[in-house]
From Swiss-Prot:
Gene3D superfamilies for this protein: 1.10.10.200, 3.30.70.980
Name of this chain's protein: Probable transcriptional regulatory protein CCA_00169
Annotated GO biological process: regulation of DNA-templated transcription
Coiled coil: none
Top-rank taxon: Bacteria
Keywords noted in UniProt: Cytoplasm, DNA-binding, Transcription, Transcription regulation
One GO cellular component, as annotated: cytosol
SUPFAM superfamilies per the UniProt record, alphabetical: YebC-like (SSF75625)
Record bears the keyword Methyltransferase: no
Primary residence: cytoplasm
Record organism: Chlamydia caviae (strain ATCC VR-813 / DSM 19441 / 03DC25 / GPIC)
Record-level Gene Ontology MF annotations: DNA binding
Amino acid sequence: MAGHSKWANTKYRKERADHKRGKIFSRTIKELMAAVKMGGPDPKTNARLRVVIQKAKDQNIPNENIERNLKKATSADQKNFEDVTYELYGFGGVGIIVEAMTDNKNRTASDMRIAVNKRGGSLVEPGSVLYNFARKGACYISKSSIDEATLLSHVIDVGAEDLDNDDEENFIVLCDPVELASVKEKLVALGVTCSEEKLIYVPLRLVDCDEKDGEANLALIEWLEQIDDVDEVYHNMA
């Protein structure tokens, strides 16, 4: 979400994009291991695992990495991964949502407390920040693969809700979460390649803050994004 902020300069956006690629790979590997824990290591009988393996291949994760983690997931010592969400208030009334996938919730909670101790802000009760955001389905499409006008016409055709142009590298087609699979399928049928699809949080309103608070919020967000278990950080800073 940093691309939406006037405080996020080009250098920050590039560094974040590079870091995010690594996070995507890490998240997919964790999803793969969770799928094995839930339904076994055979993709022929585990539909969820079959989908995640295809996702990993689409992201160009090497086959040897996939195979190695499939074996690791069957180990009795390997704990299962869980999705967890944290809500924070940063500086100047800015709300922050953190999504993580972890095999140790105590470790992740400790990392979150360290983040606010080092960079400020406050962890708050569930629901305290979420009401400022809407859950949306999102299909990511490389800006190098299609022009905006063409994609916009497709967005209307497939019944999506909006086209977000604020990301540095991708157009983001937004839709109702329950329609995500259908929207992606229709886009693919029209020849559009979706590099990633997932559920995201979109701010319902943006919060203006001064330069001091803006820089403090970015420092907090950067720290949160560096936590190993964290996959996504959303905020509503203008």
